[in-house]
Amino acid sequence: MNAFSIVGKITEMPILKETTNGLKTCELPVRVQRNFPNSDGVYENDDMVIEVWRGHAETVSASCKIGDYVGINGRIHSRKYQKDEKVYLNYGFVAEKIDFLR
């Protein structure tokens, strides 16, 4: 099973873009508080960028604002690329369901 689920706060406005194939997309920056404190008792945050596609991208870019809370379910994807004869692997997060938590 390939799935993730987060609840976090939007930190920047997403910009709606269109691919050469006509698909709508945007990147949604979200700050998520960790569910455990560090050694000083402080709950730190993780900043993530979530890929949003098609109708979800249009809705998110038109409806959200900085500071809004969202719940996101999705999948993790990987991309391989080669540089200087070394193979690298990048991971990204793709939204499949977005709930606006206002």
Set out the residue ranges of the language-model regions.
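Single-stranded nucleic acid-binding surfaces, predominantly the OB-fold ssDNA-binding core
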Residues: 1-102
